[in-house]
C-alpha cells in the first residue's frame, strides 16, 4: 500500500525501525501502549486491550 506511510512500498511490510503498518493496535507505525482499549465492550462482553507487543487486538476471553 503505497499510500500508507508505515509501509515499505516494495515489501508491503513496516519500514525499518517501525513496528506495524495497520491494525487496531497500530498508531503512527508503532504498537499502541499495553492497556489501550482497542475494542469497546458491547452487551455482556468486556473491553479488549492492546498488549503493547502486537498490532492485533486480542479478544478478551472473559465475560462480565
Curated annotation (Swiss-Prot):
Protein species of origin: Macrovipera lebetinus (Levantine viper)
Limits of the Disintegrin domain: 1-64
UniProt GO molecular function: toxin activity
Keyword flag Membrane: no
Protein name: Disintegrin lebein-1-beta
Pfam families noted in UniProt: Disintegrin
InterPro entries the UniProt entry points to: Disintegrin_dom (IPR001762), Disintegrin_dom_sf (IPR036436)
Sorted UniProt keywords: Cell adhesion impairing toxin, Disulfide bond, Hemostasis impairing toxin, Platelet aggregation inhibiting toxin, Secreted, Toxin
Entry keyword Isomerase: no
Entry comment describing in which tissues the protein is expressed: Expressed by the venom gland.
Amino acid at each position: 500500500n503505497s499510500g500508507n506511510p508505515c509501509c515499505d512500498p516494495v515489501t508491503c511490510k513496516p519500514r525499518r525501525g517501525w513496528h506495524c503498518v495497520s491494525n487496531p493496535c497500530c498508531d503512527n507505525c508503532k504498537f499502541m501502549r499495553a492497556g489501550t482499549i482497542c475494542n469497546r465492550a458491547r452487551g455482556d462482553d468486556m473491553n479488549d486491550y492492546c498488549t503493547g507487543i502486537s498490532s492485533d487486538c486480542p479478544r478478551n476471553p472473559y465475560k462480565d
